[in-house]
């Protein structure tokens, strides 16, 4: 009897404890961090399902002990603990269809409210459910680092996202790469995903080690761009690393020289061209090993600059040198030098090849001069379409000799020049004599050559409406140099017998007076005559003849093929014998009422 009573008491106590919800089940959802700025409002919300009976809900702040803030009972309502300001802490209950939300509103918070807040539900019969929030109240901070990277074009640039990171970085940090130029910002990467659709970086950007940015190849358009990496440690703490790119390009230099006239001025033009320049560079001229200061008489410099569509600069400097008879030396050496900035505060020094020329090559001939030395034109234009105009990189001087002597050019020409000078005649055509006579006289030279020029005077042809007799000291003497060019062995576009006669576009007539002074009077442009030798055929005629024969053979072939097709169509069809006759067999019926066999064969 006593043992049975003991069991009943124990069972009753257990039932009472179940009824009062004494069996507590603790569900800790883990530490949920909530970040908030000082002075802002924060809502802390937790909810539970409606499958159990709600007994009580409460919010508490967890310190050394649990400090209760507010309690809610479905029957008795809300109850705030003493010392809690209702204006700054308000609780609300929202009943949904299948759940109940329990929210704590914190208004105008400060750093003193930072800490852990516990939300608990007392349910019957499941017990107590608890959720803990970690409220962090601190100002927004951004640790920013700026730097500049200098690099050449067509190189690979690697920009790290962060360096010397500490242990406070969470494994769940997020990052993003942005690029900015001229106030326009674009997102390149976010969370390992390439989100940029810009054509300027198509196929050039990628992620490297430790979330670094890899840019290859570097282009001129990348100059001035700022690449920023945002490493978000928390919603209130961001590390930002900004890298500004400065791009440099090593220039290419090219120098040319041309002789624009052959008169007494002896003008020469030197052109220094600087390509693929970035940023801008400066061009300096050196004459006989010394820097040109710009205050020398007879030397003029003009500078031009142009920005191409690719972003590179193109600089052009032109030095014009007028012949000075009082020069101490007969030769002059000229070259140009470019100074351009490079990465790491260094300067690139790019120089052209020195060009040396003679100052005496621009002397004009007098009325009767056995041997006269002149300068060739800087840019020669030829009538033949396949002979491109050339420009001498060094001064090319020639000696006027007798038409029977072949004098080679003592100064080398450029590799682009395919024409060699054979005869140069200063002619003064007379009335009744045309340019054809002068060309025949130029082409009458023999095949042999002597090592030294002849001292025989050149031929002078009188101009129209002028006399060939002796002239007065004050009378004008018109002289026009005609250059006879023959193709060299290296020129495949002209035959070995083609002769091209070219006269200068505009040349001054020399007026000689009795006292030795010289007056200049400009003449007019003469024509260009191309003479074909009697014993040969020019290449255009040969090409036209060959083309005519090819077209003729093709036409004959087409005509033959058409005739063959016509013959095939007109042929009679092949003979086809008729089919053999069909033989019928007679079957006589036993009744004897049918037709005889011979009658059926007739039918």
UniProtKB/Swiss-Prot annotation:
It is a single-pass type I membrane protein. Gene3D superfamilies: Immunoglobulins. Residues 438-450 have a biased composition (Low complexity). Keywords: Cell adhesion, Disulfide bond, Glycoprotein, Immunoglobulin domain, Membrane, Repeat, Signal, Transmembrane, Transmembrane helix. It comes from Rattus norvegicus. GO terms for cellular component: cytoplasm; membrane. Residues 24-132, 139-245 form the Ig-like V-type domain. The gene is Cd96. The keyword Glycoprotein applies. Residues 412-436 have a biased composition (Polar residues). InterPro entries: CD80_C2-set, CD96, Ig-like_dom, Ig-like_dom_sf, Ig-like_fold, Ig_sub. Homodimer; disulfide-linked. Interacts with PVR. SUPFAM superfamilies: Immunoglobulin (SSF48726). Residues 1-21 form the signal peptide. Residues 251-356 form the Ig-like C2-type domain. This is T-cell surface protein tactile. The keyword Protein transport does not apply. It is found in: Membrane. Residues 359-383, 403-482 are annotated as: Disordered. Residues 559-603 are cytoplasmic.
């Amino acid at each position: 009897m006593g043992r049975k009573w003991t069991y009943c008491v124990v069972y009753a106590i257990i039932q009472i404890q179940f009824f009062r919800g004494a069996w507590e089940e603790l569900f800790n959802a883990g530490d949920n961090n909530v970040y908030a700025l000082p002075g802002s409002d924060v809502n802390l919300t937790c909810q539970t399902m409606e499958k159990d009976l709600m007994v009580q809900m409460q919010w508490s702040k967890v310190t050394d002990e649990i400090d209760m803030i507010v309690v809610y009972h479905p029957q008795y309502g809300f109850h705030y603990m003493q010392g809690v300001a209702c204006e700054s802490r308000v609780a609300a209950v929202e009943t949904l269809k299948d759940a109940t939300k329990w929210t704590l509103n914190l208004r105008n918070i400060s750093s003193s409210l930072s800490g852990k807040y516990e939300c608990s539900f007392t349910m019957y019969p499941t017990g107590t459910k608890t959720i803990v929030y970690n409220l962090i109240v601190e100002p927004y901070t951004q640790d920013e680092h700026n730097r500049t990277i200098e690099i050449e074009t067509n190189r690979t640039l690697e920009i790290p996202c962060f360096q010397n990171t500490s242990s406070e970085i969470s494994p769940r940090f997020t990052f993003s790469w942005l690029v900015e130029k001229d106030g326009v910002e674009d997102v390149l990467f976010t969370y390992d995903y390439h989100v940029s659709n810009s054509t300027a970086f198509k196929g050039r950007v990628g992620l490297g080690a430790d979330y670094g940015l890899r840019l290859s190849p570097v282009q001129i358009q990348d100059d001035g761009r700022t690449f920023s990496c945002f490493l978000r440690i928390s919603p209130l703490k961001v590390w930002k690393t900004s890298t500004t790119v400065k791009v440099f390009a090593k220039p290419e230099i090219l120098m040319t020289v041309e002789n624009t006239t052959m008169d007494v001025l002896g003008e020469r033009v030197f052109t220094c061209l600087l390509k693929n320049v970035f940023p801008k560079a400066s061009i300096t001229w050196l004459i006989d090993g010394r820097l040109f200061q710009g205050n020398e008489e007879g030397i003029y410099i003009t500078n031009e600059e142009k920005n191409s569509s690719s972003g590179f600069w193109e600089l052009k400097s032109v030095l014009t040198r007028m012949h000075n008879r009082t020069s101490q030396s007969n030769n002059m050496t000229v070259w140009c030098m470019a100074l351009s900035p490079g990465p790491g505060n260094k300067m690139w020094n790019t120089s052209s090849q020195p060009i040396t020329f003679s100052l005496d090559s621009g002397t004009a001939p007098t009325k009767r001069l056995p041997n006269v030395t002149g300068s060739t034109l800087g840019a020669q234009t030829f009538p033949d379409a396949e002979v491109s105009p050339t420009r001498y990189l060094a001064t090319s001087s020639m000696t006027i000799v007798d038409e029977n002597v072949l004098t080679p050019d003592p100064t080398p020409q450029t590799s682009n020049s395919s024409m060699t000078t054979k005869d140069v005649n200063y002619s003064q055509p007379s009335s009744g004599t045309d340019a054809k006579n002068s060309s025949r006289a130029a082409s009458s030279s023999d095949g042999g050559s002597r090592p030294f020029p002849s001292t025989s005077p050149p031929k002078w042809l009188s101009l129209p409406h002028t006399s060939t007799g002796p002239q007065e000291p004050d009378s004008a003497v018109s002289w026009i140099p005609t250059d006879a060019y023959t193709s060299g062995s290296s020129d495949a576009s002209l035959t070995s017998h083609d002769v091209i006669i070219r006269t200068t576009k505009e040349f001054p007539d020399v007026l000689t007076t009795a006292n030795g002074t010289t007056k200049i009077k400009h003449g007019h442009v003469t024509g260009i005559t191309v003479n074909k030798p009697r014993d040969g055929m020019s290449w255009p005629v040969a090409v036209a003849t060959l083309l005519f024969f090819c077209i003729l053979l093709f036409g004959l072939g087409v005509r033959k093929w058409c005739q063959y097709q016509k013959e095939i169509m007109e042929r009679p069809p092949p003979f086809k014998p008729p089919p053999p006759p069909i033989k019928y067999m007679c079957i006589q019926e036993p009744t004897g009422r049918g037709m005889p066999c011979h009658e059926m064969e007739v039918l």
